[in-house]
Amino acid sequence: MNKVILIGNLVRDPEARQIPSGRLVTNFTIAVNDNTPNANANFIRCVAWNNQANFLTTYLKKGDAIAIEGRIVSRSYVDNNGKTNYVTEVYADQVQSLSRRNQSPSDNNKVNVDTMMESYTGINTDAAFSSNKPQTTLSSTTSNLNKNNDEEDEITSWINLDDDLE
């Protein structure tokens, strides 16, 4: 089984581009903290397609906390100088924003990580972390994301890529 779950922060603003087949793609990097005494960060290259690419470029920016679920992919390509380069990156099947404006980072992570863990494990963590903040799960294809900034701040969006892959 090839499955990766990462929580980190965007290293730079995501930028989408359209490839010749018409598909939208975003290459982005997240910084994932290492929970060791020296606390080094790992910089993980990621790729999102179509709906995720649109979500990342529309709603997220440098420094925003995100969770991704995906798989590790290794590939190679030949650059303009004829040199073969090898790349390992995470193809993001799901992307969730963990950032909420006007909240402290500790509230931010506590509420959203609980929700994310429940979605992966089926275990309700409300008993361990009592929080009165609402959680809304919304498909990226709905138009509710554009209503206003207050609602946008309260939305946790999961976007599934499985249907977009060829």
Curated annotation (Swiss-Prot):
InterPro entries: NA-bd_OB-fold (IPR012340), Primosome_PriB/ssb (IPR000424), ssDNA-bd (IPR011344)
Key words, A-Z: DNA-binding
A cellular component annotation (GO) from this entry: nucleoid
Recorded superkingdom: Bacteria
Disulfide bonds: none
Residue stretches making up the SSB domain: 1-99
Alphabetical list of Gene3D superfamilies matching this protein: Nucleic acid-binding proteins
Any one GO molecular function term: single-stranded DNA binding
UniProt-annotated stretches for the region Disordered: 126-151
Gene Ontology biological-process entries: DNA replication
Biased composition annotated in UniProt, kind: Polar residues: 126-135
Biased composition (Low complexity): 136-147
Subunit field text: Homotetramer.
Name assigned to this protein: Single-stranded DNA-binding protein
